[in-house]
């Protein structure tokens, strides 16, 4: 029967209302980043949710959940061929169950069943039932499963006695029991069918009632909700075939919640889950099942969800070398709770389709530990075998991802996690490092909670990050794959268990007084509803790799109580080689801070290898771990050289349903009045560290000299990282750290280059003063020898004095040459100190000097250049300025600058001869003294004259209003527009208050500027960084003519602009054929003179003329000042393209900016004005919607330039 629901339609209507009332500007998203769930598509596609597929309707009642009866024979054949390895795993699981029925069968008595956590019984039923379906001849197994289900159906309920408020065990039991019932339906007698079905009905009804009152019914993206909703859906689907409309209500409830889940997951651009890998595998198990069931039963297609496309990396990039252990962010065991082989084969079959999922599932199964703490729990190890069998696609040949075999850095910008060396075999050279500094709930959830774009989200009440840890700025280190520093995994939420800093004495300490760690600690679950905890956040400042060197840093001050009066808790990690890790803590506190002590912790869970005290070079205290005579060492010191002894402790903590042992090194430092800096060095057995010390510790940053394997490395790290000018001054570029050694300097985020001089430092083997003293002593000794000779051999006094004079002159000359070659200062007594100090500052800036960037963005209107705002918006490094706006307008010049496009090129000679003085002064003011320029803008209420001017500027748009609205209404509307523009100026001013060194980014809306970049070059000089955005002419013309109603072509009044292009109006000068006219526009002028020219032809000639002229004119600009960027590259390859743009600017791409551009290009949740949603699919929508004759016309006109830019022909 067709299942239609008014309730579901009501849900859609509420969603439409919620999105229609969403504010324009949200969090780190610009005013164009409007969250939209593609309501039109939602309506057309998802109102059919409850219309079962006709195929299912016509087939037998059961099985129908994951497959129908007609597929069983094929599944049995696969068990002997392509699926043999999975069948063997299922058969092995069943053999183990049959060998120990006392353990695996549900207890005969309900009291025993309810006495402990009992998810094992629901989890093991589906693979057992699938085996019986594949091997109906195995009567022993079938009798076993009947006894299994008879016992479960005989219980009065499936609750756990000591957890009466937790329905998760019921959810597992219901999912398993209903799935097994569906699989075995045709093998059961009628009595059992009816009895089992009644039990499923009763339990499903209970779950539905619980969903209305329990927190899991409201808390999204949480493992409890996903688990219980899948249970409710499974029960509804199984009973709904036989029972009526009540089951449909249950289905509706699940779909409403799970579609919200999928919608929110789409905001998470990196495929992660905030609950960590272990619980993430738990939630993902249910999400993949929902996606499959929703498509199979309701025709709901979520396979384009961006989170699913990225979720593979959540498993691959968190794996330590050897494929057995994962990084344990948040509550975790050593790897996964459920799967992840099932999730991986699902992703491969339906999303990736490249064999990578099958390959990783294969590696994980191959390397599964047979014993020890990393063995999967008996309650969970087989729970996803049935879905893995059903989803496995043998046609996808297992193959690793691209670049497999080389250690790579992977950044999860939403999660706030960086890993290095993941997904590799366990060999001596494969090292793993992880770093965590993220926002509570992940960036997307955090922003949604704080900026409330959706009315159906009730702040933190709609989420449950209770499994997260107080772990901002935490890290792990496994040189050679041997875990040296690990997390403490599942346990109480205490900061000292998470390798982060704690402080004392703190007035707000809630446990371990007087010490206090990060917000939300001190309980079994993170107290995310506590005071200030909802605002807790860390931030990864930078993450970059060059060769085997990695630099990562994070700020965690917002994760600590404001009562501690901390200004910065900045931690930097530098992996120098596969076995040497330098960790630096920079702590800055306010003058009235009560804190005077800081304590660091480093954990290891491996009971076989214990930490013992160690002393480095009899100078610094440390600790060592002996792994079969291989020594892994650490030591520490502050910027004064202090190195206190550590306390090495062991502890047992509650974890899941057991105790887990841990050990940790705890070292406490006394803090300085304002700034405290501490360095920790971790290194493996094949490394010789011979010295390590601070050589600079100033306000902007620090330098550490570290001698590793007889090579000196000078590490420079900026701690005033928000200040771009400070970074340029301290390092010579816009990054955050550099490493110099004898011959090269590595600038993290930009690259490595050779340096002319070897590293020089203040330890000089033969200083000048020492040489001078040696020379004087040598002269005296030789003089005494000569006197002795004179006395012994009676030499004449005259001859003696001649010899002495010659000797003195010779020695003086030699000393003079030595001074000439070494002394670089006028007063040589200061040579050693001055040169040493100078070397500190020059080490990092050795080589090519870079200027602070002044960014200019230009393009033809409609080319999508506005998307670059996502790279620069809400950044401490940049101030994104739209030009023009009501208050930032371009002054008039000798030549008119058309607001759409013109054909005038400004030559260097014209600029240098004194033209455009007013415009030149305006630009210098806006760029070089931005703060003063903005302050001098008077934000007064616009008078009638200003309104009239505004009307004139927008006359095309206003004609529409005049037909519909009265003059007072128009004035009111214009006043509102001016109010928005005034608030825009105030926002720019506020940004400069927080980040005074932010560099301006001028986004020029007129296409006229594409031919005038030489003007910016002359005014701004070497600091100019021009980004010229081009777009496929077919996509551009489609966007201009068809992508919005009314079209951009009409709104911009393009025909009028083109008609004015070659005219002279009102005495205003225009460039002509003899002066400043770009000759590429001549074909367009001829086209305009034709009476039958159409819009497509005109726009094609316009694109060709403007683009060709811009490419010719801008060829003269240096590659360091000008870069062409294709809009399609930004959308299709956002990370690669934006990294190239930021390298051009001399600044590393931050994870926050990366997250913003990924959100804008990958989620279908971001749109540009007149453009609609931005996604790789939508950039090619012209291929489906643009008439073929128009495509051919565009290609005929533009082909030469299209080919040069790399745009292929479509009509071929």
UniProtKB/Swiss-Prot annotation:
Domain of life per record: Eukaryota
* Tissue specificity field: Expressed in different brain areas as well as in multiple other peripheral tissues.
| Claim: Transmembrane is one of the keywords in the record | yes
GO: which molecular function terms? chondroitin-glucuronate 5-epimerase activity; sulfotransferase activity
Q: InterPro entries given for it?
A: Chondroitin_lyas, Dermatan-Sulfate_Isomerase, P-loop_NTPase, Sulfotransferase_dom
The positions flagged as glycosylation sites are 28, 666, 688, 709, 874
The EC code for this enzyme is 5.1.-.-
What is the membrane topology here? Multi-pass membrane protein
A Pfam cross-reference name: Sulfotransfer_1
Q: Show the stretches that span the lipid bilayer.
A: 764-784, 803-823
Q: Where is the signal peptide?
A: 1-20
Q: Which UniProt keywords apply?
A: Glycoprotein, Isomerase, Membrane, Signal, Transmembrane, Transmembrane helix
Q: Cellular component per GO?
A: Golgi membrane
Q: Which compartments is it annotated to reside in?
A: Membrane
Family in the record: Belongs to the dermatan-sulfate isomerase family.
PANTHER family in the record = DERMATAN-SULFATE EPIMERASE-LIKE PROTEIN, PTHR15532
List the protein's name.
Dermatan-sulfate epimerase-like protein
Q: Which organism was this protein described from? A: Homo sapiens (Human)
Q: Which gene encodes it?
A: DSEL
């Amino acid at each position: 029967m067709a299942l239609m629901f008014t309730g579901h339609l009501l849900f859609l209507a509420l969603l439409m209302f919620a999105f229609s009332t969403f504010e324009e500007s949200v969090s780190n998203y610009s005013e164009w980043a409007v969250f939209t769930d593609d309501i039109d598509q939602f309506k057309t596609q998802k109102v059919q949710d409850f219309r079962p597929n006709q195929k299912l309707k016509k087939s037998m009642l059961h099985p129908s959940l994951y497959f129908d009866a007609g597929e069983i024979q094929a599944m049995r054949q696969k068990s002997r061929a392509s699926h043999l390895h999975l069948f063997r795993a299922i058969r092995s699981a069943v053999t183990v169950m049959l060998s120990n029925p006392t353990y695996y069968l549900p207890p005969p008595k309900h009291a025993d069943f309810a006495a402990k956590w009992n998810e094992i019984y629901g989890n093991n039923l589906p693979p057992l039932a699938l085996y019986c379906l594949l091997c109906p001849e195995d009567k022993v197994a079938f009798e076993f499963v009947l006894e299994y289900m008879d016992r479960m159906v005989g219980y009065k309920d499936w609750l756990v006695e000591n957890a009466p408020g937790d329905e998760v065990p019921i959810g597992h039991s219901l999912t398993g029991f209903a799935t097994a019932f569906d699989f075995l339906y045709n093998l059961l007698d009628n009595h059992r069918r009816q009895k089992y079905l009644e039990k499923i009905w009763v339990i499903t009804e209970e779950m539905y009632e619980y969903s209305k009152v329990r927190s899991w019914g409201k808390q999204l993206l949480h493992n409890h909700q996903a688990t219980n909703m899948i249970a409710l859906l499974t029960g509804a689907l199984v009973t709904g075939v036989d029972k009526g409309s009540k089951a449909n209500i249950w289905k509706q409830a699940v779909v409403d919640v799970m579609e919200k889940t999928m919608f929110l997951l789409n905001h998470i651009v990196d495929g992660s889950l905030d609950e960590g890998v272990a619980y993430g595998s738990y939630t993902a198990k249910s999400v993949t099942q929902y996606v499959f069931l929703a498509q199979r039963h309701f025709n709901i297609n979520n396979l384009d969800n961006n989170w699913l496309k990225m979720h593979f990396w959540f498993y691959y990039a968190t794996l330590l070398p050897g494929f057995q252990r994962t990084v344990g962010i948040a509550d975790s065991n050593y790897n996964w709770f459920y799967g992840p082989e099932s999730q991986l084969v699902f992703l491969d079959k339906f999303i990736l389709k490249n064999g990578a999922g099958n390959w990783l599932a294969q590696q994980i199964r191959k390397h599964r530990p047979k014993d020890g703490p990393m063995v999967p729990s008996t309650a969970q190890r087989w729970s996803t075998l049935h879905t893995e069998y059903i989803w496995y696609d043998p046609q996808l040949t297992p193959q690793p991802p691209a670049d497999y075999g080389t250690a790579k850095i992977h950044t999860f910008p939403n999660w706030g996690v960086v890993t290095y060396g993941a997904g590799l075999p366990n060999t001596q050279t494969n090292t793993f490092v992880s770093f965590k500094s993220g926002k509570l709930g992940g960036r997307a959830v955090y922003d949604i909670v704080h900026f409330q774009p959706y009315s159906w989200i009730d702040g933190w009440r709609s989420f449950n990050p209770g499994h997260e840890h107080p772990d901002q700025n935490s890290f792990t280190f496994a040189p050679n794959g041997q875990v040296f520093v690990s997390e403490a995994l599942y346990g109480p939420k205490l900061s000292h268990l998470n390798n982060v800093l704690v402080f004392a004495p703190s007035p707000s300490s809630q446990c371990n007084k007087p010490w206090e760690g990060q917000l939300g600690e001190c309980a079994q679950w993170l107290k995310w509803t506590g005071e200030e905890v909802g605002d807790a956040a860390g931030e990864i400042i930078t993450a970059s790799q060059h060769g085997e060197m990695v630099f990562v840093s994070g700020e965690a001050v917002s994760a600590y109580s404001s009562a501690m009066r901390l200004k910065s808790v900045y931690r930097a990690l530098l992996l120098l080689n596969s076995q040497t890790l330098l960790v630096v803590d920079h702590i800055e506190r306010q003058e009235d801070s009560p804190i005077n002590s800081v304590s660091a912790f480093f954990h290891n869970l491996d009971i076989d290898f214990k930490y013992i005290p160690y002393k480095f070079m009899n100078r610094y205290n440390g600790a060592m771990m002996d792994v079969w005579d291989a020594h892994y060492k650490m030591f520490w010191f502050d910027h004064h050289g202090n190195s206190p002894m550590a306390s090495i402790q062991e502890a047992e903590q509650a974890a899941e349903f057991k105790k887990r042992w841990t050990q940790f090194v705890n070292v406490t430092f006394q803090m300085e009045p304002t700034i405290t800096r501490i360095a920790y060095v971790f290194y493996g057995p094949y490394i010789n560290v011979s010295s390590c010390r601070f050589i600079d510790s100033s306000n902007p940053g620090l330098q550490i000299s570290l001698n590793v394997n007889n090579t000196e490395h000078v590490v420079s790290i900026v701690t005033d990282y928000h200040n771009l000018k400070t970074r340029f001054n301290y390092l010579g570029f816009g990054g955050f750290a550099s490493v110099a050694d004898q011959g090269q300097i590595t600038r993290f985020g930009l690259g490595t280059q050779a340096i002319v001089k070897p590293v020089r430092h203040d330890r000089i083997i033969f200083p000048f003063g020492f040489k001078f003293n040696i020379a004087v002593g040598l002269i005296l000794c030789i003089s005494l020898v000569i006197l002795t000779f004179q006395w012994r051999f009676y030499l004449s006094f005259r001859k003696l004095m001649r010899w002495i004079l010659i000797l003195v002159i010779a020695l003086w000359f030699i000393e003079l040459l030595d001074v000439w070659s070494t002394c670089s200062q006028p007063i040589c007594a200061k040579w050693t100190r001055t040169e040493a100090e100078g070397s500190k500052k020059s080490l990092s800036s050795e080589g090519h000097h870079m200027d602070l960037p002044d960014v200019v963005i230009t393009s033809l209107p409609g080319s999508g250049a506005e998307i670059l705002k996502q790279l620069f918006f809400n950044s401490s490094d940049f101030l994104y300025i739209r030009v023009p706006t009501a208050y930032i307008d371009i002054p008039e010049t000798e030549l008119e600058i058309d607001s759409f496009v013109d054909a005038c090129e400004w030559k260097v000679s014209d600029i240098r001869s004194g033209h455009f003085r007013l415009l030149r002064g305006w630009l210098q003011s806006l760029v070089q003294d931005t703060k003063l320029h903005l302050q001098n803008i008077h934000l007064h209420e616009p008078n009638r004259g200003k309104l009239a001017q505004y009307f004139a500027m927008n006359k095309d748009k206003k004609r529409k209003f005049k037909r519909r609205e009265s003059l007072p209404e128009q004035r009111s509307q214009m006043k509102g527009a001016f109010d928005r523009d005034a608030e825009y100026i105030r926002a720019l001013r506020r940004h400069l208050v927080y980040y005074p060194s932010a560099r301006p980014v001028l986004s020029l809306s007129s296409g006229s500027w594409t031919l005038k970049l030489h003007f910016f070059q002359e005014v701004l000089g070497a600091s100019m960084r021009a980004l010229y955005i081009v777009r496929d002419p077919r996509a551009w013309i489609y966007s201009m003519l068809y992508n919005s109603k009314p079209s951009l072509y009409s709104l911009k009044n393009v025909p009028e602009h083109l008609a004015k292009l070659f005219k002279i109006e009102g005495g205003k000068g225009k460039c002509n054929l003899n002066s400043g006219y770009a000759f590429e526009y001549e074909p367009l002028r001829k086209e305009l003179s034709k009476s039958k020219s159409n819009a497509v032809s005109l726009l094609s000639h316009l694109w060709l003329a403007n683009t060709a002229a811009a490419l010719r004119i801008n060829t003269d600009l240096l590659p360091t000042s000008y870069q062409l960027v294709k809009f399609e590259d930004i959308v299709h390859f956002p990370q690669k393209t934006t990294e190239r743009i930021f390298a051009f600017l001399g600044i590393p791409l931050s994870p926050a900016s990366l997250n913003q551009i990924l959100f804008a290009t990958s989620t279908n949740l971001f749109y540009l004005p007149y453009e609609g949603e931005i996604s790789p699919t939508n950039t090619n929508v012209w291929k489906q919607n643009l008439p073929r004759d128009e495509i051919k016309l565009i290609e005929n006109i533009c082909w030469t330039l299209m080919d040069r830019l790399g745009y292929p022909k479509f009509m071929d």
